[in-house]
């Protein structure tokens, strides 16, 4: 039912990833700050978003779009809305760390029906469609259906989290929550890309994840991937 959209998104996500890899670990990142000194954007964020948006408007001119850098675009009031984070994990990217991702979701009448997350450097592609399950394609080309971890206890679980950019307003910034939960779990990871974190949850590579003050574009695609892999997403 949603194959048309998936077949459109796959090359789109990979094309955005190629833009990011072209700048990665180079001297021409064009790093700027946004809301504060901790919140950064790069030339690759802007160019990959423009590439995605242009393709969507060319193929689906009647659709709406919400994206991280450009905000609301396209046709207001459309039954279809695309939710895009062109480069999730910009801090990692700007530091030369390889965990970052392209996140593209499509909503129909407010419900997410397709989600794709692509980690360009790692060569990992995750996707899901409503009622169609969740899948991952590795760099080698192997495709497998995803299923979340079956672990039932915190003591055996490895969790992931992240930290908001509002350190000036909220000094605790999730560190208080981390301190409370550390004694009860096997370990905690901070990968630096919410979309990739959640994709790892869907793949059973991590057992749980929480984060504060995320935006819709951070998690829209990956939330569907988690749900279609048998996971639970709550706010």
Regions found by a protein language model. Give the residues of each.
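DPxDG-like acidic metal-binding loop motif
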Residues: 76-135
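Solvent-exposed alpha-helices and their adjacent loops that cap or buttress functional pockets
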Residues: 74-76, 109, 127, 150-154, ...
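Residue-level signal for inorganic ion chemistry
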Residues: 20, 45, 56, 90, ...
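Hydrophobic/proline-rich hinge and linker segments of small-molecule sensing/allosteric domains
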Residues: 134-138, 159
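An extended, acidic
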Residues: 147-235
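Short glycine/threonine-rich catalytic loop with a Thr-x-Gly-x-Asp
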Residues: 45, 93-96, 191, 195
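N-terminal subdomain of lithium-sensitive/metallo-dependent phosphomonoesterases centered on the IMPase/IPPase/PAP
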Residues: 1-87
